[in-house]
Amino acid sequence: MASSTVPVSAAGSANETPEIPDNVGDWLRGVYRFATDRNDFRRNLILNLGLFAAGVWLARNLSDIDLMAPQPGV
């Protein structure tokens, strides 16, 4: 992939447009900054709602598994 020459600043400003990452490292760095930005209420709300929804989904889908039941073929 061709890398772009757009500079990436460590601290984003409020009126900065989101960038499109050109590789996995930039994408992971963006996810990390998204998850650890303590000053952005909207991002924190989205992140918390997403984590809550993932927890609800896991609880609903894993509730039918009986870990104490005898396993087939053992």
Curated annotation (Swiss-Prot):
Positions of region (Disordered): 1-22
Disulfide bonding pattern of the chain: none
Keyword Mitochondrion: yes
Top-level taxonomic group: Eukaryota
Subcellular location: Mitochondrion outer membrane
Keyword list, A-Z: Acetylation, Membrane, Mitochondrion, Mitochondrion outer membrane, Protein transport, Transport
One GO CC term, this protein: mitochondrial outer membrane
N-acetylalanine: modified positions: 2
Pfam families to which the protein is assigned, alphabetical: TOM6p
Protein's UniProt keywords contain Amino-acid biosynthesis: no
Any one biological process term the GO annotation gives: protein insertion into mitochondrial outer membrane
Composition-biased stretches (Polar residues): 1-16
Quaternary organization: Forms part of the preprotein translocase complex of the outer mitochondrial membrane (TOM complex) which consists of at least 7 different proteins (TOMM5, TOMM6, TOMM7, TOMM20, TOMM22, TOMM40 and TOMM70).
Family from the record: Belongs to the Tom6 family.
Name the UniProt record assigns to this protein: Mitochondrial import receptor subunit TOM6 homolog
Organism per entry: Homo sapiens
Gene: TOMM6
